[in-house]
UniProtKB/Swiss-Prot annotation:
Its main location: Golgi. The keyword Transmembrane helix applies. Positively regulates hepatic SREBP signaling pathway by modulating the proper localization of SCAP (SREBP cleavage-activating protein) to the endoplasmic reticulum, thereby controlling the level of functional SCAP. Plays a crucial role during embryogenesis. This is SREBP regulating gene protein. Disruption phenotype: Knockout leads to early embryonic lethality. The lineage of its organism: Eukaryota, Metazoa, Chordata, Craniata, Vertebrata. Residues 36-205 are lumenal. Ubiquitously expressed with a slightly higher expression in the liver and kidney. The chain crosses the membrane at residues 17-35. Belongs to the SPRING family.
Length: 205
């Protein structure tokens, strides 16, 4: 019985109209799937745009200097640097020049405020601490607000917990998927800490 069915199927496949029918059905299925995927993508894109316009995320970020709930004589800082640290007032200092209250010692000549050393015009920097310090410049407020508005949907889970300018710069300057070309390769292996809107320029691997 199986041999008979196989024989009949082979004979059918030899006929051109059967092959044409199979090809036609396959083509229709392919086109239908492609159009459905495109419609779904357009619908999702429109939905995100509507959500952006009609339901803006209530960002908690405050850009006023000194808006921390901590005592005014205390500073938060970037903590992780082995050699450099940035405090919430935008000062960059060597770890040995960090005061007991968490602030950089501004009396030390090497301590600089709003320092953009090693930072490019696109907002990408060689060192994390300089990225945070440069990002804390009051003039960067409009850039950061624009980023928050444009990134509302894609990054809402990450940035909803951010409450002020300092926390935003700490989060923004950390290396992200925008900085990565491949899994273990940076787009720009030198200036990989970015506070700007655009990803680093793509360098050849």
């Amino acid at each position: 019985m199986l041999n008979l069915a196989a024989l009949l199927w082979r004979r059918l496949l030899r006929k051109r109209w059967v092959l044409a029918l199979v090809f036609g059905l396959s083509l229709v299925y392919f086109l239908s799937s492609t159009f459905k995927q495109e419609e779904r993508a357009v619908r999702d894109r429109n939905l995100l745009q509507v959500q952006d316009r009609e339901q803006p995320i209530p960002w908690k970020v405050q850009f006023n200097l000194g808006n921390s709930s901590r005592p005014s004589n205390q500073c938060r800082n970037s903590v992780q640097g082995k050699h450099l640290l940035t405090d919430e007032l935008g000062y960059v200092c060597e770890r040995k020049d960090l005061l007991a209250n968490g602030c950089c010692d501004v009396s030390v000549p090497s301590t600089k405020q709003y320092c953009c050393d090693g930072c490019l015009a696109n907002g990408c920097c060689e060192a994390y601490e300089y990225c945070v310090s440069c990002c804390l410049q009051p003039s960067k407020q409009l850039l950061l607000e624009r980023f928050l508005n444009r990134a509302a949907v894609a990054f809402q889970n990450l940035f909803m917990a951010v409450e002020d300018h300092f926390e935003l710069c700490l989060a923004k300057c950390r290396t992200s998927s925008q900085s990565v070309q491949h899994e273990n390769t940076y787009r720009d292996p030198i200036a990989k800490y970015c506070y700007g809107e655009s990803p680093p320029e793509l360098f050849p691997a």
